[in-house]
């Protein structure tokens, strides 16, 4: 069975690296991007199975990325918002995200969430 491909989109290098290492250590194929423009480029190359998306980023924010990504042809990966905003649920609903996780987050919580969206039913 092929590895699930996860795209981590966050302008915070330390968070991106932490999530990448954590997911890589349990067998996921991880790609990263520091903003929405980079993320759109990666989606054309990698076709992720799940996108973990920060909302507040320079160049192109999470809202614009999500809208642009969903307007593209082809199958779309679930999007899970990862944000420090206290209204994480509302942020996720604004872009019709499939789920959300508040920062700071627990590693087990992150791994459980990723597993839920990448495990075939």
Q: Predicted segment positions?
A:
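Charged docking surfaces used in two-component/phosphorelay signaling
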Residues: 17-25
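Active-site residues of response regulator receiver
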Residues: 54
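Receiver (REC) domain active-site loop signature in two-component systems and cognate sites
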Residues: 57
């Amino acid at each position: 069975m092929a590895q699930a491909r996860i795209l981590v989109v966050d302008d915070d290098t330390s968070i991106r690296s932490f999530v990448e290492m954590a997911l890589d250590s349990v067998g996921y194929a991880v790609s990263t991007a520091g903003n929405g423009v980079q993320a759109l480029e990666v989606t054309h190359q990698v076709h992720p199975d799940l996108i973990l998306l920060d909302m507040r980023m320079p160049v192109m924010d999470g809202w614009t990325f999500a809208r642009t990504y969903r307007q593209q042809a082809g199958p779309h990966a679930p999007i899970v918002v990862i944000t420090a905003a206290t209204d994480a649920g509302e942020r996720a609903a604004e872009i019709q995200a499939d789920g959300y996780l508040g920062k700071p987050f627990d590693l087990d919580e992150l791994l459980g969430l990723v597993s839920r969206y990448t495990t075939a039913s």
